[in-house]
Amino acid sequence: MSPKITVEKLNLWYGDFQALLDVNLEIREKAITALIGSSGCGKSTLLRCLDRMNDRIEDVRIEGSVRIDGEDIYRMKKADLPRLRKKVGMVFQRPNPFPLSVYKNVAFGPKVHHMAGGAEIDEIVERSLRAVHLWDELKDRLNESALGLSLEQKQRLCIARLVAVKSEVLLMDEPCSALDPVATLRIEELMRRLKSDFTIVIVTHNMQQAARVSEETGFMLLGELLEFGRTTDIFTAPRDKRTEDYITGRFG
């Protein structure tokens, strides 16, 4: 089976500073891939390359290719970026619901993309909230502001927004770092359920989390993807001593 995402010879500079060095990576479809490494290693920069969010940063230069379903996203015209961002959704470290009602948060994307109207929107909202296990909690609060939800509920709502527009890839940048341990485990369980329909890439400082939820893991160091493989292999039999040193806490 062809990979969902293929990264080849990817290099990125912030001004004169090179943040990514010749990254090559294949990400499987409908699986969870984790990127680990110490702060500043380039893992979040790499994640943001997968939906061209780094384009928004001044003085960024990128070389190489990122192909999703065979299409090189760095050859896309700017007019095609909304299509890319619909297909590839981002879940941030801090949940960022719109200052709107719960209902309008989920309905916003389908309306903007002209996916549905009227009663169909109602169905999309319910289906999306059910997918993230929020419907039973919020079905009587749909008209309340999303800003009044708990942190965990806000994060689930942000994921529901991506479900609503039928994103195919979910990029998660430290999605549990603001949550308590119980909420973290619930988000991890949600990720496991969602992977049957989505390709998920998660950046995390939490190595236990990477070991729990992912099938494949990449270890990054100083802008290089130093090692990539099955998560069980990375954590039990790493090929590179620097990977072993990081996982065992000798540095990081």
Give the residues covered by each predicted segment:
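ABC ATPase NBD coupling module
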Residues: 61-62, 72-89, 112, 234-238
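Short helical segment in ABC ATPase nucleotide-binding domains corresponding to the A-loop/adjacent helical element
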Residues: 51, 103-112, 122, 126, ...
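Conserved ABC ATPase signature
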Residues: 143-149, 153
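Helical segment within the ABC ATPase nucleotide-binding domain
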Residues: 185-196
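Conserved ABC ATPase "signature" region
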Residues: 65-72, 119-140
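Catalytic Walker B motif of ABC-type/P-loop ATPase nucleotide-binding domains
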Residues: 170-173
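ABC ATPase "signature
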Residues: 228-229
